[in-house]
C-alpha cells in the first residue's frame, strides 16, 4: 500500500520469516479459549469508541472513511483514535474525532515491552466500550483485550485476530473498503469510501503564497517506500523517468512542476532535478504534512510512487497518477475515480517484506505510459484505476 501495515518488531525478535510461521501457529492455538464464550452483542448506543491503527500515513488516511461512518452512526459518542507520532498529523484536524491517543513506538518499528504495557494503560484509562482494530498484528489486536475493552472489532488475517469479539475476514478488496467492513460487521451502514484530510487555514495560506505559478500545477513525489521499521526502495520509479515527464509538463503543457518529499528525500529530488532541462519548484523537506496537503490541494495532478502522499492527494481532492511496483493497486491504489494506477505486476509477486529487486515490476512502467496517463487525467478523461 502507500505506507504498508508495519508489523511489530520487538527488540530481540527472530527473523521475520520464522517469526511469521511461529506467530501463525501460536495464534491458532491462542484463539481457542476466546471462542469458548459467545461474545456480547454490540451496544446500540455506545458512549466511547476507539479506533486503533498506529501506522502508517497511507493506512491512516485510508481509515478516514471509517471515522466518518462511525460519526454518522453515533453523532453523540466520544470517538478517539490511537495512532503513532509518524501518522498523527494526518488526524489532528479531522472534525469527526474527539481525541487522539498516542501509541508511542508501538506499531511503528521496534518497541519494547515497557512501551507496550504503557500503551495498554493509556487505552484502559479511556474507558472505551468498543475498539475497531485496523492492524493485522496479533500484538496490536491484543491491546484492547488487555485494556479491558469489552467489544473488539477488527481485521482477522490468518487467525491473528484471535482476541477479537468480532473478527472480520481479510478478503481481496481495497484496504479502505476492508476497514469499512469492520463497521458493517456490527450493523453500521457505510457509504462508498471518500478519504478526508483538512489542512489548517494557515497551511492553505502558505500554499497559496508558494504556488502563485502557471497551471497546470503538477506535483511530483519521486521518493517513498520508507516507513518506521521498513525501507522498500523497490517501490521507487527511476528518477530519470520522473525528470522526462516533468520536462514535458513544463515544455509541452507550459505548466509548473512542484517536487515534494519529506526530510531525507532531498537526494531523490536532487537526482530528478539534475536530469531535468527546466527548473522545478523544489519543496522537498520544507513542508509539514499539513502544508503538503495544502499544496496538493492546489495542484491539478500528483504524479508519484505508492506513498502516503499519494493517498494525501486523493484526500484533498487532487487526482493522482501513481506508479506501482511490488504492491497491488487493487488493494492499496489511489481510491478515486479520476486517478490512474500504472502497474505491471501480477498476483504471483511475493509478499512485500520478501520482495527482491529482481521481483519488482516498477521499471516495466515506461515514460510514455506515465506521460499518456498524466495528459489523460489533466484532460479529465481518466478511467478508475489501471
What are these regions (language model features)?
Residues 1-386:
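Catalytic machinery of carbohydrate-active enzymes
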Amino acid at each position: 500500500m502507500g505506507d504498508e501495515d508495519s508489523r511489530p518488531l520487538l527488540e530481540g525478535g527472530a527473523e521475520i520469516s520464522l517469526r511469521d510461521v511461529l506467530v501463525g501457529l501460536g495464534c491458532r492455538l491462542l484463539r481457542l479459549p476466546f471462542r469458548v464464550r459467545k461474545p456480547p452483542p454490540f451496544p446500540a448506543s455506545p458512549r466511547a469508541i476507539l479506533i486503533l491503527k498506529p501506522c502508517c500515513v497511507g493506512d491512516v488516511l485510508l481509515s478516514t472513511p471509517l471515522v466518518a461512518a462511525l460519526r454518522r452512526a453515533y453523532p453523540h459518542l466520544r470517538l478517539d483514535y490511537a495512532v503513532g507520532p509518524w501518522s498523527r498529523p494526518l488526524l489532528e484536524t479531522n472534525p469527526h474525532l474527539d481525541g487522539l491517543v498516542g501509541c508511542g513506538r508501538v506499531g511503528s518499528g521496534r518497541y519494547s515491552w515497557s512501551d507496550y504495557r504503557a500503551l495498554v494503560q493509556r487505552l484502559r484509562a479511556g474507558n472505551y466500550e468498543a475498539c475497531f482494530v485496523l492492524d493485522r498484528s496479533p500484538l496490536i489486536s491484543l491491546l484492547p483485550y488487555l485494556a479491558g475493552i469489552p467489544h473488539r472489532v477488527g481485521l482477522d488475517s490468518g487467525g491473528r485476530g484471535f482476541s477479537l469479539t468480532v473478527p472480520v475476514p481479510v478478503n481481496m478488496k481495497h484496504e479502505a473498503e476492508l476497514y469499512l467492513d469492520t463497521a458493517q460487521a456490527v450493523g453500521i451502514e457505510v457509504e462508498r469510501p471518500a478519504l478526508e484530510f483538512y489542512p489548517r487555514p494557515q497551511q492553505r495560506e502558505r500554499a497559496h503564497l508558494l504556488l502563485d505559478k502557471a497551471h497546470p500545477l503538477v506535483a511530483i513525489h519521486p521518493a517513498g517506500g520508507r516507513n518506521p521499521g521498513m525501507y522498500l526502495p523497490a517501490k521507487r520509479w527511476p528518477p530519470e523517468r520522473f525528470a522526462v515527464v516533468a520536462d514535458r509538463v513544463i515544455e509541452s503543457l507550459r505548466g509548473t512542476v512542484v517536487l515534494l518529499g519529506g526530510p531525507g528525500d532531498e537526494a531523490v529530488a536532487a537526482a530528478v532535478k539534475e536530469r531535468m532541462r527546466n527548473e522545478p519548484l523544489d519543496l522537498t523537506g520544507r513542508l509539514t504534512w499539513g502544508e503538503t496537503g495544502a499544496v496538493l490541494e492546489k495542484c491539478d495532478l500528483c504524479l508519484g510512487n505508492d506513498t502516503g502522499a499519494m493517498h494525501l492527494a486523493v484526500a484533498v481532492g487532487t487526482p493522482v497518477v501513481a506508479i506501482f511496483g511490488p504492491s497491488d493497486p487493487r488493494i492499496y491504489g489511489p481510491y478515486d475515480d479520476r486517478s490512474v494506477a500504472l502497474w505491471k505486476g501480477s498476483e504471483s509477486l511475493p509478499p512485500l517484506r520478501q520482495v527482491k529487486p529482481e521481483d519488482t515490476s516498477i521499471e516495466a512502467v515506461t515514460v510514455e505510459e506515465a506521460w499518456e496517463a498524466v495528459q489523460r487525467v489533466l484532460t479529465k478523461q481518466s478511467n478508475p484505476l489501471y
